């Protein structure tokens, strides 16, 4: 089974492009800042920054409603791949493919109290 659930904030606005052709499809790429459990000795939170990709309707949703700092819950899967770059070096990739994206807090909740969260289904 390959299933991932992440909650975090976008590190920057998503990059969205559309495939060419008659049935063009949206592809959104973004990075999430996901806090790790526990804290460093200095009291700061450690975080991971997974690269994420959404396709189709999910990508259109991301383009329209999700921006830098937006807190989301993403359900998806991990996908690995590789390619050869322009210097003829093989590069390995790991991405989270988004299957469902939800808001982790309402606009009002994000401005007032982050403990009060409201989920909005995509």
PLM regions: where:
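Short, acidic/hydrophobic/Gly-rich beta-strand patch recurrent on exposed beta strands
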Residues: 29-34, 51-54, 94-96
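Beta-rich strand-turn-strand
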Residues: 55-91
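Acidic, gly/ser/pro-rich intrinsically disordered tails
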Residues: 1-2, 17-23, 39-45, 88-89, ...
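A short glycine-rich, His/Asp/Glu-containing loop-to-beta-strand
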Residues: 5-7, 25-35, 48
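OB-fold and OB-like beta-barrel modules that bind single-stranded nucleic acids
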Residues: 5-11, 32, 68-79, 98-101
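Short aromatic-glycine-enriched beta-strand elements
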Residues: 18-31, 92-94
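Active-site/binding-pocket entry motifs
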Residues: 12, 35-38
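A beta-strand/beta-hairpin structural motif
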Residues: 40-64
């Amino acid at each position: 089974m390959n299933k991932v659930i992440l909650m975090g904030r976008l590190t920057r606005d998503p990059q969205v492009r559309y495939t060419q052709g008659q049935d063009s499809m949206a592809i959104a790429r973004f990075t999430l800042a996901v806090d790790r459990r526990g804290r460093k000795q200095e009291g700061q939170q450690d975080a991971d920054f997974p690269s994420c990709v959404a396709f189709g309707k999910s990508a259109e949703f991301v383009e329209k409603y999700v921006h830098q700092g937006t807190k989301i819950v993403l359900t998806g899967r991990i996908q690995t791949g590789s390619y050869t770059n322009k210097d003829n070096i093989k590069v390995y990739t790991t991405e989270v493919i988004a299957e469902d994206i939800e808001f982790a807090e309402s606009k009002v909740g994000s401005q007032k109290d982050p403990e009060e969260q409201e989920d909005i289904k995509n």
